Amino acid sequence: MNDSCRVAILLAAYNGEHFLNEQLESIGGQTEVQLDIFVSVDLSTDKTLKLFQDQAACDPRIHVLSYGERFGGAAPNFYRLISEVDFSDYDFIAYADQDDIWFPDKLKRACDVLRSGKADVYSSNVTAFWANGHEELIDKAQSSRRLDYFFEAAGPGCTYVFKQGVMLKLQEFVRTLPGHVKKEVLHDWLSYAFCRERGYRWCIDPMPSVRYRQHADNVVGTNNNWVAYKKRFALIRTKAYRKRVESLVGTVAPQRLADISNRFFLLKNFMQLRRRKRDRYFLLFMLLLGIY
């Protein structure tokens, strides 16, 4: 491919030494693209930093940002990457978690979709996998709803790929965020809401592009079973989910906060609040009971 796209990959890491070699091998083996990997390591207690430094010494595509700050979570670490990396030499920008395995054509598929003019941002389904060998498709590719981005992300952030122009606008916005927002609002959810609220076209590919590792240290994990629904119910019952929604809306679309905080508005528009039908009715049930 003579006209291969150039992709900047933003990788946030923390105590990730066990899975990083496999992850980096899968990223480095991407087909028909040119790439650079920008790494921000949260203050860790294992050999994560040394692993990246050793890899960077052998691979000029790996760039490790300055080390020593305690970010306290994946989101502020990603916001640091978004704010500091220079995207001027890249066509597209992708997020990467520290412990997943990318399919070889992950970036090529994303680049093809974005170059076709059909979308401004790309994400995809993923194949979750566990240490016991179990695998499961995590389907996030339902049709978008008018307000879904205020109540959920587009899926795992490790599948997100942005056109340069979109990322530059997002970068400009992230640089203005106060510190407490960077700790409260997940980077992938904010990225999705920012883009959708500003009219950027978002494609969720039904074809999985990543093997999404599940283990005890996952920041979010899957939301695809009854255990997940129990956790979601607990978040709703304690008002934590509502606080997250309102914090997000107040950040990316403060003019909409009055509506999104209004129970009657949400009841009237419940069909627009989530992409998946069963999630819409689950949220409706929570609204009717006054739990949300």
What do these predicted regions represent?
Residues 1-226:
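Nucleotide-sugar donor-binding/catalytic module of glycosyltransferases
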Residues 173-180, 190, 211-292:
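C-terminal subregions of glycosyltransferases and related glycan-biosynthesis enzymes
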